[in-house]
Amino acid sequence: IYTRTIMKHYPEINKIGIALLFLVGLASCTTTTIDEFRQGETGIENNESVVILGRRQASDYETRSEFVDCVGERMTRGDDAISIVPEQEFVDAMFPWFEPRTAPLRTRDLERLMTEDVVADRMTEFGIRYIVWLDGFTETTDRSGSISCTIGPGGAGCFGFGSWEDDANFDARVWDVGSLSNVGTISTDATGQSYLPALVIPIPLIARVEANACSRLATQLKEFVNGS
């Protein structure tokens, strides 16, 4: 009886519930595309490692260290797992050659660096076979809607609706330390729509574009490095 009374006097609750379920489904949908351009043969031995470094030379953005760590951590999972040297550990050990202002931009710069005995020795100590340069960022666009919050004698509440689109775009360039050459590039682009409906309490429905970009890129990189 109580349920019927509620639905009789507040039929909009049912509509809102259906709308929220629909939005949850939409928010969980992220479109991710992967492009691979191979320029050389690849493969890796059990005693060899990969280091993933974020590009941070751009004036308007930096590749987030959290994304770099995410890709590296996922590459250590499952079948054909890759040994990953943590970015900060590598940069600290190689100081000052891999700081943002001094890091090699081209393979010929790496070739010049490898003539330094200390650089070559530390590469050998880490067992580095490949350096992966990650470059990119996640951008939020197409914001729309509005939410207003009020406080009154009966309490506080927020009402309204907002949405936005997130686009995560990253490139991974793979350098072979053995041959001092660029052996390929993998690009990922993930897009998704996020929503923020508010009926008394705001309920964020977030598209996990960066997490999806990380997962897909890590899987592709692992296959690429293994020569699959």
What does each model-identified segment do?
Residues I1-I6:
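Short, Lys/Arg-enriched N-terminal segments with co-localized hydrophobic residues
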Residues K8-I18:
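Bacterial N-terminal signal peptides that target proteins for export
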Residues C29-E48, E125-F126, T138-R143, F159-S228:
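C-terminal/domain-edge helix-coil "capping" segments
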Residues F37-R38, R112-V119, T150-F159:
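N-terminal post-signal-peptidase region of extra-cytosolic proteins
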Residues E48-G54:
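Short hydrophobic beta-strand segments
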Residues G54, A58-T140, V177-S181, T185:
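N-terminal segment of the mature soluble domain
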Residues E99-R108, S148-C158:
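Flexible, solvent-exposed loop segments that connect beta-strands
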